[in-house]
UniProtKB/Swiss-Prot annotation:
Lineage, broadest ranks: Eukaryota, Fungi, Dikarya, Ascomycota, Pezizomycotina
Native species: Gibberella zeae (strain ATCC MYA-4620 / CBS 123657 / FGSC 9075 / NRRL 31084 / PH-1)
GO-annotated molecular function: heme binding; metal ion binding; peroxidase activity
PANTHER family: L-ASCORBATE PEROXIDASE 3, THYLAKOID LUMENAL 29 KDA PROTEIN, CHLOROPLASTIC-RELATED
Protein name: Putative heme-binding peroxidase
Record Pfam families: peroxidase (PF00141)
Length: 331
């Protein structure tokens, strides 16, 4: 697949600290006609999410510092399958702005993409550092397993320090992107326009009739509905449906379905909080933690842990068929 390499073609390195220039380069790369729905935006949001969602508040390990997905132990986690694409998309930006760390670039790309796709402008602070080797990576098993229910969702998100309202707000990221059987075992998109940030995800959760569907290639169960207006099939994951069957989660689903502005405000705050997990700052906002210790809390093993990591030819592909990053990788 050809990658639209616009920032590199524009030639000139920016001044260190010019994050507006970095954002401009990210926006230039969002249009990817040969990739999912013509946009790199959703996978950049997922990269920011997964690079931050390893945090454990008890041990103060994991989080957005380090850019651990450059190494096989984290990048090769089946939960991160397909994110090689996001890293490949951003490599021209890194070459054009070599002064920015990968951990800052990945998180900045997420908030930039959300805003460019019609979402809220999310507060973001720089200063993250990159690991120099793979000795300080968080353990696998900390990211959500979409095949599970409400108990698992709380297990994962409470560990990071989120409450029920924040959990549902962050789930609204499923307004963007789609699932690929080759990556997660699930297939399809949640909403009609997966490159436009909105509250349609919540409205569809409540308005549609969701029926069970098994994906033949993976044997995983998801939920399906055919949109009456467009006649296209949409899907929901077990974790999505759990938001409607749990009484506490459900009240926030109903709130966000009715009021997009409230959802945007709550998502803005929750996503900013997510990107700061594991980051210690002084009164001036400067990052003062030097690393994240390896070890700490492990969540229950996920079903996807038995799935081999995706492999394929170098470069980004529609189905996430890039090789995983090995322990000396620089992407």
């Amino acid at each position: 697949m050809g990658i639209v390499d616009q920032p590199q073609s524009k030639g000139q390195e920016s001044t260190p600290g010019d994050f507006a220039a970095v954002q401009k380069s990210i926006i230039d790369l969002l249009n990817q006609p040969d990739y999912d729905d013509g946009s790199a935006g959703p996978v950049l949001v997922r990269l920011a999410w997964h690079s931050s969602g390893t945090y454990d508040k008890v041990t103060d390990t994991g989080g957005s510092n380090g850019a651990g997905m450059r190494y096989e132990a984290e990048g090769g986690d089946p939960a991160n399958a397909g994110l090689q694409n996001a890293r490949v998309f951003l490599e021209p930006v890194k070459r054009l702005h070599p002064w920015i760390t990968y951990s800052d670039l990945w998180t900045l790309a997420g908030v930039t993409a959300i805003h460019a796709m019609g979402g809220p402008e999310i507060d973001w602070l720089p200063g993250r550092t990159d690991f120099v080797d793979d000795s300080k990576l968080p353990p696998r098993g900390r990211l959500p397993d979409a095949a599970q229910g409400a108990e698992h969702i709380r297990h994962i998100f409470y560990r990071m320090g989120f409450n029920d309202r924040e959990i549902v707000a962050l789930s609204g990221a499923h307004n963007l992107g789609r699932c690929h059987t080759a990556n997660s075992g699930f297939e399809g998109k949640w909403v009609n326009n997966p490159t436009r940030f909105s509250n349609q995800y919540f409205r569809l959760l409540l308005s549609e009739t969701w029926t069970e569907k098994t994906i033949p290639e993976s044997g995983l169960l998801q939920f399906s509905s055919v949109d009456q207006d467009t006649e296209e099939e949409l899907m929901m994951l077990p974790t999505d449906i759990a938001l409607t069957t749990d009484s506490e989660f459900s009240k926030y689903v109903q709130l966000y379905a009715k009021d997009k502005d409230v959802f945007f405000q709550d998502f803005k705050k929750a996503f900013a909080k997510l990107l700061e997990l594991g980051i210690a700052r002084n009164s001036e906002g400067k990052v003062i933690n030097t690393d994240n210790q390896k070890g700490g809390y492990r969540s229950a093993p996920k079903k996807s842990d038995s799935t081999p990591a995706t492999s394929g030819q170098p470069g980004a592909s529609k189905t996430g068929g890039c090789p995983v990053m090995h322990h000396k990788a620089k992407l």
